[in-house]
Curated annotation (Swiss-Prot):
Belongs to the paramyxoviruses nucleocapsid family. GO terms for cellular component: helical viral capsid; host cell cytoplasm; ribonucleoprotein complex; viral nucleocapsid. This is Nucleoprotein. Pfam families: Paramyxo_ncap. Homomultimer; forms the nucleocapsid. Binds to the viral genomic RNA. N0 interacts with the phosphoprotein (via N-terminus); this interaction allows P to chaperon N0 to avoid N polymerization before encapsidation. Interacts as N-RNA template with the phosphoprotein (via C-terminus); this interaction positions the polymerase on the template. The lineage of its organism: Viruses, Riboviria, Orthornavirae, Negarnaviricota, Haploviricotina. It comes from Human parainfluenza 4a virus (strain Toshiba) (HPIV-4a).
Amino acid sequence: MSSVLAAYEQFLQTTEDRGFGDQQFVQSDTLKAEIPVFVLNTNDPQQRFTLMNFCLRQAVSSSAKSAIKQGALLSLLSLQATSMQNHLMIAARAPDAALRIIEVDAIDPPDYTLTINPRSGWDDIKIRAYRALSRDLPISLADRTVFVSRDAEHAVCDDMDTYLNRIFSVLIQVWIMVCKCMTAYDQPTGSEERRLAKYKQQGRMLERYQLQTDARKIIQLVIRESMVIRQFLVQEMLTADKVGAYTNRYYAMVGDIAKYIANVGMSAFFLTLKFGLGNRWKPLALAAFSGELVKLKSLMSLYRRLGDRSRYLALLESPELMEFAPANYPLLFSYAMGVGSVQDPLIRNYQFGRNFLNTSYFQYGVETAMKHQGTVDPKFASELGITDEDRVDIMQSVEKHISGKAGDDISQPRSAFTMSLNRSAFITNNNPQDLSGARLSNYEQGWSGIDQDETRDTLPESTMHRFQNIDSTNSDHNELQMPEFENDINPFNHPRFTARAPLIPEISHQTPTIRMNRNVNIRDSTRDDRQDANEDRSSNIPDDILGDLDN
């Protein structure tokens, strides 16, 4: 039997192995679109700054074709190099690249009229056409410029230090748009603004040369559509990673942003390793996990064999990326997401509510994480010399502060209640259809499918003590026990509690006979008060008015 299991493990590794560089297989050339790129033959800062603005306008132009926008971005990414043409040779090695080098002798700042070297073979018609493209900006851009500041485009640039600050401010924004270009480009997450604020604080980006939001989105779509640009960017990130700590300003910036781009599209795989295998808890010994553990082992071997490019599989559109999809290990993925929802408050930003999410193993992961929040690793404790008394003290301290809290509750300030309420305890009877079409939260999707009668059996032990005072037949008593939630279509939001007026004691604790007699007395007294009020009102009417009515 052991030989069969070993053969199965080898079989999985063989199915994921791929041989690269085999001389027997040569890919056929495909048709390519010609990409015009501009190369400036001078290092004059004013000329380079003007070409930078010209390339930005070409990249966001409403009339420019895709190849023209791609060439403008490649030219923009090479404006920091001493020799632009040598730097563009990195992009020329791409299989789909058909670059046409356009040598520019000079460019006029006011209207972006190009002076093309005769070797490029351009006539006045193309020069006028590109000048018209640079003027045709989208109507969504304010002040007819790509920058937030309206006067930034036509500022004087007479020294190299000023030019470098401006070109790096623009390039760092282009690199920021690479982070989400292949995964969640149409989902605003706020990460873009946080990274812009980070580089402003570090002094790497000038706020005056911040691009407008619509301009950045257009640039992101150009990067998403172009394999040539993405292969060029991957090569730049690999270069920044290999040069080490002592590097120039540009590659230091690229190496920093590359940390955000690495392993994009593989979050499910790494989160499963972190929360599923990293804790080394006993549930990994389940027989249901045995097959998926072998799969994860083969995937880790595949990741190492792919080398440096394994971090950028999404940018390169590599077919190996499909091997790391969580559908290949659904049970371990569901269990890991349950553990992560308790341990990491930021896991709620990750959309793990997939069709293959197993709610039973998700709930089991939640219970396992809650059970182990106060435990101590025996091996590491022995290395630190922790005694049994210290271990008990540590477990009690942890249990005191975070026991019974979900991952979202740990990061929030303490409320007016002595104990924070776990959202998993307040599961309503509402069906998913009752939420007016709103998407269920990750945590609610994980707890979906549980009947109200089964809630007490499936919830973790740390939350069960909250139901001990609710089992009462008195409806008034039940209303006093539970706080009233504000109306919110998303039950996963943090509950805010409103003060509930107490019931009147003399009404709620009287017998029906006493209540009926009390109501009769109230009606009689009310009728007498109305009669007295009518008599007083009639006595206050003036006599002349009564006389006129009699006549």
